């Protein structure tokens, strides 16, 4: 391999890395825009106390909070929300979504 071939390979590799970096930046930007849109909808359809509760949930269970957010956004977009969601309504929604845990008591007999 000559110097020209090595320079061409380096140039192609550099272009490939730049394209990959640009694609990653575009994806991050799209995710940020989508998150901003979701937050905007949530601010419109939720009372501050309910948003605070959802943010607290997000700290401990981010996937669950994202699922709840998606459900609230879909309710808002379908027009099924007549008023802002209060903290009490959010708690009711959460109890419906969270699967009920079964408790087992193991006792030794004898």
Swiss-Prot record:
Q: Give the family, as the similarity comment puts it.
A: Belongs to the PDCD5 family.
Cite the Gene3D superfamilies for this sequence: PDCD5-like
Q: What are the entry keywords?
A: DNA-binding
User: Domain of life here?
Assistant: Archaea
The record's GO CC annotations read: cytosol
Which NCBIfam families is this protein grouped with? PRK04239.1
- Return the Pfam families for the record: dsDNA_bind
An MF annotation (GO) of this entry: DNA binding
- What's this protein's name? DNA-binding protein Mlab_1482
């Amino acid at each position: 391999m000559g110097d020209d071939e090595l320079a061409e390979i380096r140039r192609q590799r550099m272009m490939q890395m730049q394209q990959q970096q640009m694609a990653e930046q575009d994806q991050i930007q799209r995710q940020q825009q989508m998150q901003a849109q979701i937050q905007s909808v949530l601010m419109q359809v939720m009372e501050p106390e309910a948003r605070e509760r959802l943010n607290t949930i997000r700290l401990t269970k981010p996937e669950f909070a994202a699922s709840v957010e998606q459900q609230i956004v879909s309710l808002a977009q379908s027009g099924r929300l007549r008023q802002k969601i209060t903290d009490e309504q959010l708690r009711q929604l959460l109890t419906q979504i969270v699967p009920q845990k079964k408790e087992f008591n193991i006792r030794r007999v004898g």
